[in-house]
């Protein structure tokens, strides 16, 4: 997805939409012995944000990583649907990115029946792309006046970009996704350390999240909560 956008295959980007619905916090799990629920909904342990801190930061990072553009301001409304919960469990965010790109971001942990359905869509002047976490091997390319194309992961799919091929591990038809993504991050970081120790230049194809992405995630949380409280756009 990132390569398709950076190479201009769908034209100048106009809009991006990312949604991240989960349903596991639809009830007051934190009142029981569910440790995963208890710390995530306790502001003394997780900070000022609930769902936006837990999964909203991943959605925001996805927007910036795929488009290659930074969020410059946002307007949000967060909600607490489960009575007695101390932190928000749902929210919607309008995004303005660099280069006049507009976006929508939705996260929810009270979307009953959902598991972990992260999905991102990007539209440009000449087409769009769609990818979802539950089917990580597939990416839909939607070009203007053309049938939709289904692009599949796999080291033997030569139509993929060099970047995509460098992060595939198995031949096409074999499932790979969540666990392999972590492995790629660890491998890419190890390459960077090795290159540094041997005075070699890093290959930008092997990228990984840095402290800057972590910092931007914290800024996102602050801006979302402030925007929702003050009912205004926050840069």
Task: Give residue spans per PLM region.
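C-terminal glycine/acidic-rich active-site capping loop/insertion
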Residues: 65, 73, 92-97, 126-208
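A general structural signal for well-ordered alpha-helical segments in protein cores
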Residues: 59-60, 185-190, 221
């Amino acid at each position: 997805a990132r390569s398709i956008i950076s190479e201009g295959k769908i034209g100048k980007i106009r809009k991006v939409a990312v949604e991240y619905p989960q349903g596991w916090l639809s009830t007051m799990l934190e009142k029981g012995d569910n440790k995963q629920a208890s710390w995530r909904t306790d502001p003394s342990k997780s900070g000022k944000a609930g769902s936006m801190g837990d999964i909203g930061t991943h959605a925001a990072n996805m927007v910036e990583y795929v488009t290659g553009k930074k969020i410059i301001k946002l307007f949000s409304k967060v909600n607490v649907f489960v009575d007695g919960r101390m932190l928000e469990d749902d929210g919607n965010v309008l995004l303005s990115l660099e280069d006049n790109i507009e976006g929508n971001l939705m996260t929810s942990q009270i979307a009953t029946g959902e598991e972990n359905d992260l999905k991102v869509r990007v539209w440009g002047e000449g087409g769009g792309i769609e990818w979802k976490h539950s089917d990580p091997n597939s990416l839909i390319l939607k070009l203007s006046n053309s049938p939709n194309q289904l692009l599949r992961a796999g080291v033997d799919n030569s139509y993929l970009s060099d970047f995509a091929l460098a992060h595939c591990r198995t031949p096409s038809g074999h499932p790979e996704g969540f666990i392999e993504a972590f492995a790629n991050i660890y491998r890419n970081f190890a390459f960077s350390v090795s290159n540094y120790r041997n005075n070699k230049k890093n290959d930008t194809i092997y990228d990984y999240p840095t402290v800057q992405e972590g910092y931007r995630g914290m800024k996102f949380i602050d801006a979302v909560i402030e925007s929702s409280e003050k009912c205004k756009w926050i840069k």
